[in-house]
Amino acid sequence: NNAGKLTYGPLLEYGWGNYTSHLDSGIRADGNTKYYGIGMIVRQDNNSGLYYEGSVRYGRMDADYASGDMIGAGGSKVYADYDSSSSYYGAHVGIGRVSKLNDTVKADIYAKLLYTHQSGDSVILGGAGNGEVYDFDAVNSTRARLGARLSKENGERGTYYAGLAYEYEFDGEAKATVKGLSTPAPSIKGSSGMLELGYIIQNKDVNAPAVDIGFQGWSGKKQGFSGNINFIWKF
């Protein structure tokens, strides 16, 4: 278009990971998650370097949970576990500006607002709590992210990048009930910092397929490491 370049298309996503949660009551739990979904993404890059983008997505998440810190009827710690499966949907909008610092280095300053809704589920507890039913409420996550990324072209082979971001979670509380009583509710509400490093494999043709390999480290309310591999085709 006259203002720049409009890019849009479908997306497929799949991911997996593991987690550890700590409640104020002293209960520690560990688990694994995986998700898979579809969506749509759109981005407008203006000739001035300004860009804005958005996406919507829908999918399903499977998770398991295990803890040896649950309190049994006798007051001592017991082991319990469960499996869960529920749908999710989400969306994001963002705005930023890419500035060319020299022939091979660019700076990207951006702001994003991200929203995710994960549906509730009822699970049957295994282990010492065998047979008890836990009803999980839906979880809503609304996050604001401000960040910057530097990228450097690596000749004809691709682009290195590194970035920093600040993220604030406005919600993210996971509530549940058992026998009509509320359980301790973990929450990721609060501030987190993110450091990212990555490499995009792509030749000089801007419409050529690309592979984006990235790693992220988190500190603050969210702690840990994550990675991603994105396959991008433009036509």
Task: Please annotate each region the language model reported.
Residues 17-33, 60-89, 116-144, 169-192, ...:
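Extracellular/periplasm-exposed beta-strand and loop segments of Gram-negative cell-envelope proteins
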